[in-house]
């Protein structure tokens, strides 16, 4: 098990526990990454304020924000894209005639995001997904406070039909071509379990706003 991911999950769970003990009545809480590649550029408070008005808060329980380029592919799940990109190998052995690598799968995710979040023909200001973070997300406390972050893949949290679609269209293989056993507590992005559990048990609505909260910018 990847100790870095497990440590991050424990740290986020520690924040949740602090909220439970010290601020149980707050309406919202925020998770934010402060590393060099996530929340870059100046924050745009007018965007944050916009989505905290009654007009918008009625439509979401978790809200993250678009970014060009959209960097956080690992936390992203939607429709037939359920598994994290690093469930797939970075390379396959030469004798494996067909299969999907992490980079091929990332291309699939990017294309899907371009066709949904960045689709100019879609006039909606936010898009429903199964999991998304991209460095900054707001959560309704009453919906999320009793869920937890995991640093491993838990198949029981997925929508079964969507997971089956993922496995059929994009079957994960080991480098030697053998199937990946997704029941084996594989390392996974900690946000996915948090979001999927909230969707499954609390009917959470996970949304991505098309507006950029940081920037805007085209390159990073």
Please name every model-derived segment.
Residues 24-41, 213-214:
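Short, internal active-site loops enriched in acidic
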């Amino acid at each position: 098990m990847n100790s870095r991911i497990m440590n991050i999950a424990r740290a986020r769970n520690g924040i949740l526990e602090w909220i439970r003990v010290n601020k149980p009545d707050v309406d919202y809480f925020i998770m934010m990454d402060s590393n060099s590649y996530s929340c870059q550029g100046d924050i745009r408070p007018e965007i944050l304020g916009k989505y905290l008005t009654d007009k918008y808060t009625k439509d979401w329980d978790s809200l993250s924000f678009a970014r060009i380029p959209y960097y956080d592919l690992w936390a992203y799940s939607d429709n037939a894209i359920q598994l994290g990109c690093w469930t797939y190998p970075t390379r396959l052995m030469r004798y494996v005639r067909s299969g999907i690598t992490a980079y091929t799968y990332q291309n699939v995710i990017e294309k899907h995001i371009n066709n949904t979040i960045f689709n100019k023909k879609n006039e909606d200001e936010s898009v429903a997904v199964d999991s998304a973070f991209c460095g900054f997300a707001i959560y309704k406390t009453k919906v999320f406070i009793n869920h937890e972050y995991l640093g491993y893949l838990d198949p029981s949290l997925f929508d079964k039909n969507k997971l089956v679609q993922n496995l059929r269209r994009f079957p994960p293989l080991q480098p030697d071509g053998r199937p990946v056993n997704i029941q084996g507590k594989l390392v996974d992005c900690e946000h996915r379990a948090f979001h999927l559990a909230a969707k499954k048990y609390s009917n959470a609505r996970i949304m991505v706003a098309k507006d950029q909260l940081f920037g805007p910018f085209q390159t990073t």
